[in-house]
Amino acid sequence: VRVYVGNIREIRKVDAHAIDIVTQEPFVILPQTVSRWYIMSKAWCEKNNAVRPVDVRKGTENYASTHANGTGPFKLESRQPGVKTVFAVNPDWWGKAEHNLSQAVFTPIGNDATRVAALISGEMDLVDPVPLQDVPRIQKSPDLKIMQSPEMRTIFLGMDQKRDELLASNVKGKNPFKDRKVRQAVYQAIDIEAIRTRIMRGVATPAGLMVAPTVVGFVPELNKRLPFDPDGARKLLAEAGYPNGFEVGMNCPNDRYVNDAEICQAVASMLAKVGVKVNLTAEPKTQFFPKVLQRNVSFYLAGWTPVSQDSHNLLFAVISTPGEGAQGQFNGGSYSNAKVDELTRKIGAESDAAKRLAMITEAFKIHQDDIGHIPLHQQPITWGMRK
């Protein structure tokens, strides 16, 4: 949430239905970010000792972590963690309902086969996600349909570029990822077409940029990947002083992104062919994300969706040098470029669309030339539902 409210200096009550929002500095995408603010009752928070936000990076929780405030269109009727959560329509909601539901039941089903079977049997009306390999089977059913499109989320690889020695590597006394040649070698060892066709069943969109085409600031001419070139990757590693490659630990979630663990396994296999041995740790997101947020990873796979639909969100949260508040909060590898930081600050305040786009383009070009991260693709979102 800090990513969306970190620039807010003060919120003043004007009257019962109006507030003034005061920012630290001009912030042109404030209207887009307001929709991501989750408003809670002050009285409820005070009553339940949940006024102070918790720090997910430290694994802390409070009452609000497991209980609903109930200010939305639905209210919590019952909850069995990991089993079932039942919502009923909130008759006191301040908005206008745009549905005909009386109840919504959410049932977490971690097993892909069981989830699909629940849809096919009629036990569930809608499931998300549908495993890509099951899409054709559902499409053949006369009672079911698939809704699928590319997400705004870009899946990427990050590398620790700050430590003098990686946390997980056989290289001692230096950090291979500080060398651009090594980062380029890793990039060019990855066969993105193989990942697209074999793992993503042809429905992922390969990415050369860290944002999707639907995001403000997307630059088509920069959306080009470095070519897959394993021979060139081996040459770059040798030039960087690693003719026999090296070992590195990789962290990857196995329950967050579409086929995340399978992608990481493929990346590990591809890097092995150029001499980089990847020791992969695929783990639940509850274990994975605290490590990324604390920047205790050497090499990792993650994804980002600029929910403001603006490139500034990604530049500020993922690419900027980690700093005060939410700046660089999701920059797990501590990539840092002073010029990118300067441009990001200006982009947040610039209201002239043409000037702003020029600065976004410059920032992305610098980051791309640095190989600050390695973009992979925009993953698909796939829902299965009853007709």
Stretch-by-stretch model annotation:
Residues 62, 91-137, 180, 277-279:
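Ligand-site clamp/hinge motif
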Residues 74, 188, 205-239, 256-260:
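Structural transition elements
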Residues 33, 134, 171-215, 259-263, ...:
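Periplasmic-binding protein-like
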Residues 150-168, 173, 287-348:
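Acidic-aromatic pocket-rim loops
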Residues 2-52:
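Surface-exposed binding/hinge segments that line
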Residues 125-126, 143-146, 249-250, 263, ...:
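Periplasmic binding protein-like
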